[in-house]
């Protein structure tokens, strides 16, 4: 992602939805001593987590920390940034068009945006699959879990994680005034598992706003149903007999219009 951003020494990088700083810290050596990286997130706890080990960067003027949402970057002045990066952030934003307008506003003319987003609705809903594992014998229980979590297809228009695809993001980018847009859609289907055992699966949440898989199972199923469900999954998960599928969009966007 950072390679595609083409960050140069002396530039100002704004990482929107910085989280634990994966992208922002990676940009620090690229901007050099004369550049600056701004960590931006809605979570003050995450900003504090990023700030603590690198106070010297803030004192030296090489790092900034701003609490703001992608769709409202009002603390960031107009035309003050050379590069905007955002990774797996827009899936949590309902007003995606507003986020793109804010990206355009804070960018200097002829600068760029780099976006990496999973396209969660690329694959159709499949009740025969549960997080990459064959669930055909317990299909009815899978359906009960997803309905309980509001993940049936009827709710997709209201779910910011599911109500868009790569074409929608392209449309938002153009409407915001980003003149040159390059889109790369990457789709992967691979054998294997993304978790080592059932305990890790049930302890995992699909996103920071969601319940863990175990909590979702407990909320949707009776204890007897949950026992049946986990008894089916355990040998598959523990042996890694699954299939991983993913679709994501990575696109450098720019330059902005003057």
For every predicted segment, state its role.
Residues 161-176:
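Short alpha-helix
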Residues 71-83:
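A short acidic, Gly/Pro-enriched loop at the edge of an enzyme's catalytic core
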Residues 97-112:
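A short glycine-rich, Lys/Arg-flanked "PGG" loop and its adjoining helix->strand segment in the class I
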Residues 112-144:
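Conserved class I S-adenosyl-L-methionine
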Residues 12-73:
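Class I SAM-dependent methyltransferase SAM/SAH-binding core
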């Amino acid at each position: 992602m950072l390679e595609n951003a083409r960050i140069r020494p002396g530039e100002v990088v704004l990482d929107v939805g910085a989280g634990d700083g994966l992208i922002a810290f990676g940009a620090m050596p690229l901007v050099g001593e004369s550049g600056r990286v701004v960590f931006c997130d809605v979570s003050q706890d995450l900003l504090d987590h990023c700030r603590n080990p690198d106070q010297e960067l803030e004192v030296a003027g090489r790092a900034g920390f701003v609490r703001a949402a992608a769709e409202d970057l009002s603390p960031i002045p107009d035309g003050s940034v050379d590069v905007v990066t955002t990774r797996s952030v827009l899936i949590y934003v309902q007003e995606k068009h507003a986020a793109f307008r804010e990206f355009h506003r804070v960018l200097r003319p002829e600068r760029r945006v780099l976006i990496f987003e999973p396209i969660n609705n690329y694959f159709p809903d499949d009740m025969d699959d549960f997080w990459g594992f064959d669930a055909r014998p317990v299909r009815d229980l899978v359906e009960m879990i997803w309905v309980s979590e509001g993940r049936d297809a009827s709710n997709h228009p209201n779910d910011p994680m599911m109500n868009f695809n790569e074409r929608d993001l392209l449309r938002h980018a153009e409407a915001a005034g980003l003149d040159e847009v390059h889109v790369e859609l990457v789709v992967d289907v691979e054998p294997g598992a993304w978790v080592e055992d059932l305990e890790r699966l049930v302890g995992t949440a699909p996103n920071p706003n969601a319940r863990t898989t175990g909590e979702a199972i407990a909320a949707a199923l009776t204890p007897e149903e949950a026992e049946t469900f986990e008894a089916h999954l355990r040998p598959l998960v523990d042996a890694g007999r699954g299939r991983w599928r993913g679709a994501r969009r990575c696109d450098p966007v720019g330059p902005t219009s003057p």
